[in-house]
Amino acid sequence: MKIALTVGHSLLKNGCYTGATGKKYGGCNEYKWCKAFSKQVAAALRKNGHIVHRIVCPEKSFLSPSQERPYKLDRINAGNYDLVIELHLNAPCRCSLTTLRICQTMTSKRYVIL
């Protein structure tokens, strides 16, 4: 299977991270953690015979978080992937909600997105 593995969020040109941080609660920086974890996930998927492309936004390049989506979508849409996975962490507070989406493409492939 051809898989795109994307890392949620980025490091902006001004040095700010666009993801959440749970450091206040003993956690971690979402972007840094997902970026590191994506290497492990990609290696495991490749070991099982899949073709994996990691898509990580260039660091200290974007001025705004709104530049992340088109950067990733251009690469995803050009890649003809069977599956797209984007890594995120849940927030360390009770105010955030998780979303589950199921998408179906024109080629009738179904996907679950967390």
Outline where the language-model segments fall.
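Polar, enzyme-active/binding microenvironments
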Residues: 44-47, 88, 113-114
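Histidine- and/or cysteine-centered catalytic micro-motif in compact active-site loops
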Residues: 57, 88-90
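Mature extracellular/periplasmic domains of secretome proteins
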Residues: 66-81, 102-105, 111-114
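Active-site histidine-acidic residue metal-binding/catalytic motifs
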Residues: 1-73, 79
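A short, glycine/acidic-enriched catalytic loop
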Residues: 12-29, 91-114
